[in-house]
């Protein structure tokens, strides 16, 4: 899912077919990424963020919980080391921002994380952004 906010495009999760989805929808630039949780179908497209660093002029800001960051660093270790690039754009540049369930701001917009569960115990985040609520892979939404 991508939201066109006042200060740019905010992507939620990077599925393995991210590149095809962005091309199909004619999305030319992603200004930031929120992650709901660390399952493969939500993170395995992170490598496709590599082109956006050129257009932005800086690393792509990513917002996630510590467990998601850990999985991203394991799965895409080359993006988080001081490895020399073999050619321009060969390694995505990511700026990690740790979040919790406290509200925060991205691209000039308030984001309210919502604690959800994927099954009985696996924690995921949903997000309330303006009048939109994005809740994925959940079996229950709390009253508050």
What are these language model-derived features?
Residues 1-135, 139-143:
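Binuclear metal-dependent hydrolase catalytic cores
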């Amino acid at each position: 899912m991508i939201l066109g906010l006042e200060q740019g495009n905010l992507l939620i999760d990077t599925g393995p077919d991210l590149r095809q989805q962005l091309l199909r929808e004619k999305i030319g630039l992603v200004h930031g990424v929120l992650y709901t949780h660390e399952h493969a179908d939500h993170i395995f497209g992170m490598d496709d963020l590599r082109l956006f660093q050129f257009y932005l002029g800086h690393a792509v800001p990513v917002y996630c919980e510590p467990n998601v960051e850990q999985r991203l660093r394991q799965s895409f270790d080359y993006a988080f080391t001081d490895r020399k690039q073999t050619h321009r754009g060969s390694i995505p540049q990511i700026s990690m921002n740790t979040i919790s369930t406290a509200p925060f701001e991205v691209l000039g917009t308030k984001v309210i994380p919502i604690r959800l569960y994927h099954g009985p115990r696996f924690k995921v985040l949903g997000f309330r952004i303006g009048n939109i609520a994005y809740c994925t892979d959940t079996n229950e939404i709390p009253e508050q």
